[in-house]
């Protein structure tokens, strides 16, 4: 199953893997990791993904010369009133990126939303987890 096929199959769904706090952004990433990549889920909140060291992944800080690629897990810091993140941050799955924008599969942004495609800028993006060799 290719990434874009998995995205299409999950678009518009409300994914709540842990059955706590409703459909959170972390639930989407956990589903991506466990159901698509067949890897263990990462513990914690979205903001924790910027500090974690996961087998097979490398953290890439957000700088003007770095861009995520399809399949990277993008992490936003928080709280940030301008972009609407809380202290828990936000995470989403990168699908495409340019110097000014990135297209992601996101959930719970805006709060309560199901999975949706969202064109974002880089405000409050801390960086992304990138699969080694991916």
Q: Which residues are covered by each model-predicted region?
A:
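Short loop/turn segments immediately following the C-termini of beta-strands
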Residues: 107-109
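Intrinsically disordered, low-complexity
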Residues: 1-19, 101, 111-134
């Amino acid at each position: 199953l290719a990434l874009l096929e998995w995205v299409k199959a999950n678009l518009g769904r409300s994914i709540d893997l842990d059955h706590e706090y409703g459909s959170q952004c972390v639930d989407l990433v956990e589903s991506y990791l466990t159901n698509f990549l067949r890897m263990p889920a990462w513990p914690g909140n979205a903001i924790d993904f910027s500090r974690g060291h996961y087998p097979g992944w490398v953290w890439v800080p957000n700088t003007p010369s770095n861009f995520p690629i399809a399949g990277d897990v993008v992490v936003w810091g928080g709280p940030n009133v301008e972009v609407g993140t809380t202290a828990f941050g936000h995470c989403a799955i990168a699908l495409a990126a340019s110097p000014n924008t990135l297209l992601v599969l996101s959930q719970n942004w805006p709060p309560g939303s199901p999975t949706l495609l969202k064109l974002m800028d880089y405000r409050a993006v801390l960086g992304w987890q990138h699969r080694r060799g991916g």
